[in-house]
Amino acid sequence: MARCQKVDIAAQELLGVRMYDLRVRFDRHKKPIICHGLMEYETINLDSWLELMNRTYDHYMRVVLETTRPDQKQEIEFILFCGTLEHKYPNIKFFGGNNRSDWSCQNPIYDFKQKLPQIDHKYSSTTTLFPNAPAWLTRIDDLYPYLYARLHNKQNYANPTPNRWLMLDFVNIH
């Protein structure tokens, strides 16, 4: 979502997208901020987007706390936020519950109890090529997802891994 896509949710749905990536952190008033790396997005109406997805039973959503270091206040708000999502939108299959620095989800902050779908992470250069990349390298990568999509999406669409979900930035580029 946000700057990793150039088309809105309705267009993504028409392109066949059924799995989304929701990254949040919380402001000092405990309000969720939709974000990705250093970028924050205030124009997204999260409730209307989730209500639309909740009308069907075929959507997955990874929920990630977008902080790079442990922060107890952020984690408490994240736990409350995730619990609210599960309760309010029971038809969406939520997963993740991890901090941005724990992509293995070995120690999630919130346990959605949803079996982690098998995912082909083909949406950025460092996370695809270097799963254990240092934090500074993944921050640099946040600046260039469009370039990666231009160079690799066509091949990634053409060669998906069987029985896995394909996660891409800029789904309209293929």
Q: Where does each model-flagged region fall?
A:
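Catalytic cores of phosphodiester-bond hydrolases, prominently lipid phosphodiesterases
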Residues: 1-174
